Amino acid sequence: MAGARAAAAAASAGSSASSGNQPPQELGLGELLEEFSRTQYRAKDGSGTGGSKVERIEKRCLELFGRDYCFSVIPNTNGDICGHYPRHIVFLEYESSEKEKDTFESTVQVSKLQDLIHRSKMARCRGRFVCPVILFKGKHICRSATLAGWGELYGRSGYNYFFSGGADDAWADVEDVTEEDCALRSGDTHLFDKVRGYDIKLLRYLSVKYICDLMVENKKVKFGMNVTSSEKVDKAQRYADFTLLSIPYPGCEFFKEYKDRDYMAEGLIFNWKQDYVDAPLSIPDFLTHSLNIDWSQYQCWDLVQQTQNYLKLLLSLVNSDDDSGLLVHCISGWDRTPLFISLLRLSLWADGLIHTSLKPTEILYLTVAYDWFLFGHMLVDRLSKGEEIFFFCFNFLKHITSEEFSALKTQRRKSLPARDGGFTLEDICMLRRKDRGSTTSLGSDFSLVMESSPGATGSFTYEAVELVPAGAPTQAAWRKSHSSSPQSVLWNRPQPSEDRLPSQQGLAEARSSSSSSSNHSDNFFRMGSSPLEVPKPRSVDHPLPGSSLSTDYGSWQMVTGCGSIQERAVLHTDSSLPFSFPDELPNSCLLAALSDRETRLQEVRSAFLAAYSSTVGLRAVAPSPSGAIGGLLEQFARGVGLRSISSNAL
């Protein structure tokens, strides 16, 4: 155990030799990434060359799951169920902690689940069936591929029939066939009814209600043939009882542009006018009211905004009051799907809601190994083509650190009672980080943004109150800014000249980060309404507990949202403030600034970047033989008038 932690710490420091001092039964993150970038995982190869490494990765995942959950294992030895799913598929039953074990518990019987999996596996592309991977408040968050089209379905059915000696092993056991099943088997859609019927049974057994489809197509068209379908265009409306959400998201080939732009996702917008893009965004109205997002503008969002808003939607679904589960899928389920499954897992973990005992390096290992490697992401192929969706996933953590992505159900302060004395520094100090806003106005060194909830009477608009120091030129600034967070806190502190720190760069970084934040910044009003009062000093006779006198504050100016100075207030040197500024970083609530969530996600991202740079690295694009062949075939298809798209199936 200590060796694993030491290896994780070494990986987070960027050491390529992180495996040197760890016991042979465990692999560090660096070795995991090396194996991942060297070969694609296949369940049937687990006992062959490199099998010992894969076995250690699998055992490490089981050990990490076992820290917080009681689980069963569905065997997939040699890929009998699916060739690119884990050989040990983990089914989480309940949290093992004393506090939670009696709160939420799965009602699923593993034997019946296993039977439904075997029966339904051909319903989805590449046999990638609906698989539960996250347990949150008793709800199963699942992943899969999209529905198989008739070509794949009949092809696999014939293959299985031929190689099983004439017996269709998926339907060999028919002792529990109901009258409803018999009725479904009539007519020309016999096979579709059968396999999709079992797929629906599996979804219902896992209590899945919401199905989120990330495909930009209604049906995947390849060389002029429909190779996959999706629930939203099922002609028989078999999935009508589920809540279907079409949230089109660019495929892995789009992330070639992300790499070519120096890994800058800000400003990178998908071309929605391509001929194969025919799946519009479609979300039931009752699911969007609480999110305050203008979904009609989705085609104008850049990659950061789109990913942020989709993640907010998924978090709102899993955090709803009902007990309904969620399915996320794309086409093959090994690029876009693990992206959002990983972001969900890491976001909920950062809130302390799942995997509560895992450290940042441990949750990172589990996410990379289980959500990406063991579920068949083709990192080798993606790296050769420059399609770095895997790197994007973990680098993107800097954009979801703020509390607006938190699933914790805390009561927001929607309004404050009017008082004659205005706002005191204690009021600012007691505001949650979520309510402090961001540095969005030019020239501001500190801004306080009071957020309003839609429809809340008496609440504040998005109006900034900025406190700008007006002291002597010798004043220096202590700045706390985190470019990884959409919201930053900047506080000016006078210091001796020798303590002066470069400030312009930090301020620019903070503003750059703020500008990339979802569509949050679009909701700021700069109308110059009546400003709030400057925080007033408390009486010396009534200091706050833990406060101290300070003599280095000088005067402060009040600036409205439009930037005009309204009035001046002076904080006298004998004023008692609700916090003090020692030479080292204080533990006061205003400068404790980093929330647990932000700290955790930053540590995960830092550990990933260190390990990735020392193993995989940010590579130049190399030509892919398979890509060249696919390109020639695509050109041929276009030449004969067939409708087709890129050869990369996601």
From Swiss-Prot:
GO terms for molecular function: phosphatidylinositol-3,5-bisphosphate 3-phosphatase activity; phosphatidylinositol-3-phosphate phosphatase activity; protein serine/threonine phosphatase activity. The keyword Cytoplasm applies. Keywords: Acetylation, Cytoplasm, Disease variant, Glycoprotein, Hydrolase, Methylation, Phosphoprotein. One of its GO terms (cellular component) is ruffle. A 1,2-diacyl-sn-glycero-3-phospho-(1D-myo-inositol-3-phosphate) binds at residues 333-336, 382. The modification Omega-N-methylarginine is found at residue 638. A 1,2-diacyl-sn-glycero-3-phospho-(1D-myo-inositol-3,5-bisphosphate) binds at residues 333-336, 382. The keyword RNA-binding does not apply. The modification N6-acetyllysine is found at residue 194. Glycans are attached at residues 226, 519. Signal peptide: none annotated. It comes from the Eukaryota. Its EC number is 3.1.3.95. Expressed in various tissues, including heart, skeletal muscle, placenta, liver, lung, kidney and pancreas. Belongs to the protein-tyrosine phosphatase family. Non-receptor class myotubularin subfamily. This is Phosphatidylinositol-3,5-bisphosphate 3-phosphatase MTMR14. The gene is MTMR14.
